[in-house]
Amino acid sequence: MKYKEIANNKEINAYLQKGNENLGQIGFTDHSKAHCVQVAHQAGKILKRMGYSEHEIELAKIAGYMHDIGNVINRTHHAEYGALLANDLLKETDMSLEDRITVIAAIGNHDESTGSPEDVISAALIIADKTDVRRSRVRQKEKSAYDIHDRVNYAVTDSKLKIAEDKSVIALNLQIDENICSMYDYFEIFLERMMLCRKSAEILGTTFKLTVNGRKVL
């Protein structure tokens, strides 16, 4: 089973689309196909850069693409719901049992409120997901109606995830407009997520660092 087959699967995409619509109704930022593709590609790039096998890269991309599928059921515990739903969907493919277990474990552990990185697949997924911070994820058109999540994402004017040549550091470098979002606001939303990225980097044998406006903050 290849990532491209998953990304073109009509049933999987229907669940993802409806989940994103559900989140829009309750005021969440964008979790559309663009986010799924971004997380999938970034998870794959992380493992490729760190020297993992093509097979592991494919599994990370599949987990990355499907990670938010549980939102179609409920936002609360969406990671766990997503793992169960993904298990049923992947049973209908030619994916081996071992690979299916790896993918659903990564999906089930990607949320900072309940999960933790268990292996390199889940670690890459977590870092890819939690570092997808960008202005285009804000759905609300009226700035006066922005909540803290909207402000934090809209404030990001540039976001780059880089891996050092010697693989010793995975660094998220952000530029934010502090007239829109204060550093306090950013950390209120993202501190727990960034700490999960740090744990994930350790699983990958490296270190996670965060800089905001050129200042090292983690």
List the model feature ranges, each with a label.
Residues S96-T157:
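Histidine/acidic-rich helix-loop-helix segments that form or flank divalent-metal centers
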Residues H77-N87, E98:
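Post-HEXXH active-site segment of zinc metalloproteases
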Residues N8, Q17-G24, K48, Y52, ...:
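Extended, compositionally biased eukaryotic interaction scaffolds
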Residues A60, G64, Y81, I107, ...:
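Short alpha-helical catalytic segment bearing the HExxH-like zincin motif
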Residues F28-H31, S116, I189:
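Non-transmembrane, amphipathic alpha-helical segments
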Residues D132-L218:
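Terminal helices and disordered tails flanking the catalytic cores of nucleotide-processing hydrolases
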Residues M1-H78:
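Acidic/His-rich, divalent-metal-binding segments that scaffold phosphate/diphosphate chemistry
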